[in-house]
Swiss-Prot record:
Classification via InterPro entries: RsmH, SAM-dep_MeTrfase_MraW_recog, SAM-dependent_MTases_sf
UniProt name for this protein: Ribosomal RNA small subunit methyltransferase H
SUPFAM superfamilies documented for this protein: Putative methyltransferase TM0872, insert domain, S-adenosyl-L-methionine-dependent methyltransferases
Keyword Transferase part of the UniProt annotation: yes
A single MF term (Gene Ontology): rRNA (cytosine-N4-)-methyltransferase activity
Function recorded in the entry: Specifically methylates the N4 position of cytidine in position 1402 (C1402) of 16S rRNA.
EC id: 2.1.1.199
Residues that, per the record, bind S-adenosyl-L-methionine: A32, G33, H34, D51, I82, D99, Q106
Keyword Transferase: yes
Amino acid sequence: MQSPHISVLLDEVLSFFKDLRGNFIDCTLGYAGHSSAILSQNENLNLIACDKDIEAINFSLKKLEPFGSRVKIYKSNFSELISKLSSDEISNVRGILADIGVSSLQIDKDDRGFGLGSSALDMRMDKERGFSAYDVVNGYSFDELVRIFRDYGELKNASGIANKIINARNLGEITSAKELANIIGIAQIKGRGVSPAILAFQAIRIEVNGELDELTNLLDSIEKGGFKDCLVTIITFHSLEDRIVKERFKKWANSCICPPGIYRCECGNNHELGEILTKKPLTASQSELAQNSRSKSAKLRVFKIKG
């Protein structure tokens, strides 16, 4: 069963999982592109997976049927999933995978409201969640809009874009992503090669789904989860996420937890969780970029939790 979504950095992910034995957790199952490839490559691994998108889960249940009892799938986020697993399951986890991005199918499906040309204005990963992009665009104050465009879209003209939205909705509700994109403007920002609409959509999507909080909670849960001898592989798609992962991996690799500026280490200098395996993030090869232009912004970082 072919996935409607092209998994990014697949060869790189497979290279890290090829020799593992035990369980691996896919924190963002999606359409099971990475997980099905890992299971096919390595018969010594079993999958425990979670996702919040019921459409993706239903697709993946069928896609992963050939692997039978090697697969468990939960409609959950990662931090909730940990509480559902037995101590034996957790102690046998040898790999954790998270692909922190929107799937191609979600972007391309008109009713999900992620794409610039969508007739819907939604952007929810979990369609059972009440809060949507419509609520942000039509309900947020000027200051709230400026905050998300500045902090999550890294837009220099955040106030100008917020003004455009306020002025437009004063004439009537904004009901589609296509309408919103035209209000913001789709011409590329000079020197950045991307339109303000794309960055504003990113900001709204992050706000709607609490994506940065979800990522932080994911990393917190891994840190406190009691995992041993376990790979942590995380794919991000923009600088905000990558920065969070990079800084957390640095913290985990730090053996000294003494306060900054202290003259002599007094903590024992043995507090590292493990080691960073990717000093610089892995990015898409030229051949992958030729096949999937959406892989351009993907970055893979890998950490090995010690045994």
